[in-house]
């Protein structure tokens, strides 16, 4: 590929974007208190959110350093660290940071991922996907 974006990296970026959308949907309409109450109030949503964030952490940890360097506004290390927090079951101390991460930091991550996917598409000369005609 002329863009230098390997297929696995592209897949990881697309997965980050999809899983981030899920995580945002899980917390839609919740304020800081609502997010902090999730472990007791809605364990299913809390576990789904935890799993989504751990998945994002794993995916972020696999991204190449040069890609991460292009987006210094993203706390790549912090996102990658979420996989470790979840894998060791120590998510409790992170609860106070959860709402700010979801409200402020996740949109920054998604914007960087979206920009990188667009950049790779532009380098390949493939702008955004075009709709297929019905007669194909």
What annotation goes with each model-predicted range?
Residues 1-136:
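Solvent-exposed interaction patches of small proteins and small membrane subunits
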